[in-house]
Amino acid sequence: MEQKRTLRVFLAVSLLCALANAYPQYQAVIPNGSSVPNPCNTSQIAQGVGHINFQGTGPLNPFGEDFKAAGKQWTTDLCDMDSDGDGRSNGVELGDPECVWSQGETPARTTDLSHPGFDEATVSC
């Protein structure tokens, strides 16, 4: 019985570690990827910018679908898109309004960011 409990705890911890480390590589390939606010609580960071669940699990949101279609890279086309239909391009929302950001560089803007996968005016939290 104790062995089963230990195994369950180990599996739960392993799963949590995997989730915590699942998407940093994607955060690094979009401007301000590790600073995108959670639209339901802007004092928190959305860990999985491309997912319905802000922790990075579950189905992809519209930005995640567009990011996947772009080869999981920041491209000018992806930057110019308005994935969530809120009237602001993904680049504007992520601090790259001119679509010139490259991985490893500091984006043109690092504050006043918004989530490119959810229209903050209509998101249901």
Curated annotation (Swiss-Prot):
It comes from the Eukaryota. It holds the Pfam family Temptin_C. One of its GO terms (molecular function) is pheromone activity. Residues 78-125 are annotated as: Disordered. Residues 1-22 form the signal peptide. Keywords: Disulfide bond, Pheromone, Secreted, Signal. Binds to attractin and enticin. A component of the complex of water-borne protein pheromones that stimulates attraction and mating behavior. Modulates pheromone signaling by direct binding to attractin. This is Temptin. It comes from Aplysia californica.
